[in-house]
């Protein structure tokens, strides 16, 4: 089941499945960071910003931007 990165609690691995339609500027920012569908993220913190790790790189996004990234939880 797909949800947004902003809805994931810390300690969870997720796979990026896509982006929410309607805000090309936000999607461009996310893509500029190198975050693409298929990436596996480990959420390190969920509040006040979403902090996650991709490989050996950590990122922090505000909840609005994290809410544009569609993910599924790893099982």
Segments predicted by a language model, with ranges:
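An N-terminal amphipathic alpha-helical segment
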Residues: 1-7
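Beta-strand/loop-dominated core regions that host nucleotide or nucleotide-derived cofactor-binding catalytic loops
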Residues: 67-75
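Short, compositionally biased
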Residues: 32-33, 50-67
């Amino acid at each position: 089941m797909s949800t947004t990165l902003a809805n994931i609690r810390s300690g969870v691995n997720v796979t990026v499945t896509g982006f929410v339609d309607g805000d090309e500027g936000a999607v461009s920012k996310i893509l500029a960071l190198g975050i693409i569908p298929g990436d596996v993220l480990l959420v390190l913190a969920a509040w006040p910003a979403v902090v996650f790790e991709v490989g050996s790189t950590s990122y922090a996004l505000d909840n609005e931007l994290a809410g544009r990234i569609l993910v599924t939880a790893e099982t």
